[in-house]
């Protein structure tokens, strides 16, 4: 008697899982696709991408270094060879 319940129990679980899976994927896949399609729109509208050039214009407290916010207006532009991209290109490997 236990053998009968064991064999039908395993097949019963497999059968119920297959039966449920036949109804569930269309609903789940629809939800996932909708979520994935809306992700770039939410990401792009709420946040802007931060670029290296905009990071150079961030205010710096006096204890961390010189204030470079108005350097373009004063005519004291930074040496272009000190730019991060230039340093990375000239770095010996």
Curated annotation (Swiss-Prot):
Phosphoserine modification sites? 54
The ranges of region (Disordered) come to 57-82
Listed Basic and acidic residues bias regions: 66-82
GO BP, one annotated term? regulation of cell shape
What subcellular compartments does it reside in?
A: Membrane; Golgi apparatus membrane; Endomembrane system
Q: How does it sit in the membrane?
A: Single-pass membrane protein
InterPro entries xref list:
Leukocyte-sp_tscrpt_1_LST1 (IPR007775)
Q: Which UniProt keywords apply?
A: Cell shape, Golgi apparatus, Immunity, Membrane, Phosphoprotein, Transmembrane, Transmembrane helix
Main subcellular localization, coarse class? membrane
Q: Which residues cross the membrane?
A: 14-32
Query: What GO cellular component is one of the record's annotations?
Result: Golgi membrane
Q: Which protein family is it in?
A: Belongs to the LST1 family.
What does the UniProt record say this protein does? Possible role in modulating immune responses. Has an inhibitory effect on lymphocyte proliferation. Induces morphological changes including production of filopodia and microspikes when overexpressed in a variety of cell types and may be involved in dendritic cell maturation.
How is this protein named in the record?
Leukocyte-specific transcript 1 protein
């Amino acid at each position: 008697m236990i053998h009968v319940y064991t064999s039908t129990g395993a097949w019963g679980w497999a059968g119920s899982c297959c039966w449920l899976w036949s109804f569930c994927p269309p609903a789940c896949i629809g939800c996932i696709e909708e979520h994935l399609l809306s992700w770039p729109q939410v990401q792009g509208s709420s946040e802007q991408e931060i670029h290296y050039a905009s990071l150079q214009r961030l205010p710096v407290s006096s204890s961390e270094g010189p204030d470079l916010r108005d350097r373009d207006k004063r005519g004291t532009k930074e040496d272009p060879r000190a730019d991060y991209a230039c340093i990375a290109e000239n770095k010996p490997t």
